[in-house]
Regions:
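Intrinsic-disorder-associated, low-complexity terminal segments enriched in Asp/Asn/His/Tyr and depleted
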Residues: 3, 16-17
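Aromatic (phenylalanine/tyrosine) cluster motif
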Residues: 3-6, 27
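Charged interaction/catalytic cores of defense and host-pathogen modules
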Residues: 29-174
């Protein structure tokens, strides 16, 4: 018989009052910390989604840095990525007649891995946000609208997955 070990344990500390904490791989986070992380993540992701041509990919880089520097979010991404072997170049971004489109994987782990791997490529290679956005066929629209459509289409689901996870963790803390 095998058992799956979880990194997360809910513990209660008693001092003057009850403090609920989330123990995450030796890293303790209380409700206030989780709210701060959630708030900062929403701000960083909003900045990224509202990027314009003058920003290039500065906010995309800040978005990735926030994910990579935040242990709870990075552990969540890593826990999903390890169960997927999808190649984003073959199964996420498809090119047809010179234009690219997003093919959304049905499996959540595959979707998260594809988005994160694509984010890594975009930021490591310092690829032009303008150039990538213009590869998606949108008809006639303004440059900034094209960039924002591209970011929403490609990365908004990743933001939703992370936000949902943070909310689930807050609920788990409150119920303990």
């Amino acid at each position: 018989m095998s058992y799956m070990l979880f990194k997360r344990e809910i513990i209660i500390w008693r001092r003057d009052n009850i403090i609920l904490c989330l123990l995450w791989g030796g890293f303790e986070v209380n409700m206030e910390d989780l709210r701060k992380i959630s708030f900062e993540f929403r701000r960083v992701s909003s900045d990224m989604l509202n990027s314009i041509t003058d920003d290039n990919n500065v906010y995309l880089i800040k978005f990735r840095e926030f994910i990579d520097d935040n242990k709870i979010i990075k552990d969540y991404i890593d826990s999903k990525v390890k169960y997927s072997s999808i190649d984003w170049q073959k199964s996420f971004i498809e090119e047809d007649c010179g234009y690219k489109s997003v093919i959304i994987p049905q499996n959540k782990n595959d979707h998260i891995k594809a988005m994160y791997d694509y984010l890594v490529v975009m930021t490591d290679r310092n690829k032009s946000l303008n150039g990538e956005a213009f590869n998606f066929h949108l008809g006639r629209c303004k440059v900034n609208e094209r960039i924002q459509f591209y970011l929403n289409r490609v990365f908004l689901p990743l933001i939703h997955y992370i936000n949902d996870y943070l909310i689930e963790e807050m609920i788990a803390l409150q119920e303990s």
